């Protein structure tokens, strides 16, 4: 089974995270940041993976450290669970509509970290969640998985729908990329490693 457990403890956050790419249950997200819990649940469900997160952060300051550190821990867990990446598709792309919004995620589990984030939010907040943290999360995730991740809102108005389409699209693209393809012998790279 492709799975991992990560514990990350700093002066700002304490995070326990477990991930299994080969089963879909359980999904249980408890970060103390309601909107973020909702987004991570969508990410896991649409990525068809088990994800359990328990985070205690300095929410009396704001949710920045919690969101970023969960992104770091999730990225580390994905990298660990993927191991040598033998037989995986490597690439994944997904377009996800959410009412008036259309979001896209395209990624490469190349071992090279890069994020292109082309999404604008009309308001700085979604409830008590800072919309700038959407990009912060994906930055931490991409750099710790060591993947190229391109995210784009092609069109849309509602900020909730924009964020939701990006989290769902990333989960779906990741599912495509991590799927083991029997047609791929070894690692899907002319270098012989990812």
Curated annotation (Swiss-Prot):
E.C. numbers: 4.2.1.19
Keywords assigned: Amino-acid biosynthesis, Cytoplasm, Histidine biosynthesis, Lyase
Residues that span the membrane, as ranges: none
CDD domains associated with the record: IGPD
InterPro entries the UniProt entry points to: IGPD_sf (IPR038494), ImidazoleglycerolP_deHydtase (IPR000807), ImidazoleglycerP_deHydtase_CS (IPR020565), Ribosomal_Su5_D2-typ_SF (IPR020568)
UniProt GO molecular function: imidazoleglycerol-phosphate dehydratase activity
Pathway(s) where this gene product acts: Amino-acid biosynthesis; L-histidine biosynthesis; L-histidine from 5-phospho-alpha-D-ribose 1-diphosphate: step 6/9
Gene Ontology terms: cellular component: cytoplasm
GO biological process, one term: L-histidine biosynthetic process
HAMAP family documented for this protein: HisB
Family: Belongs to the imidazoleglycerol-phosphate dehydratase family.
Protein name: Imidazoleglycerol-phosphate dehydratase
Species the sequence originates in: Streptococcus mutans serotype c (strain ATCC 700610 / UA159)
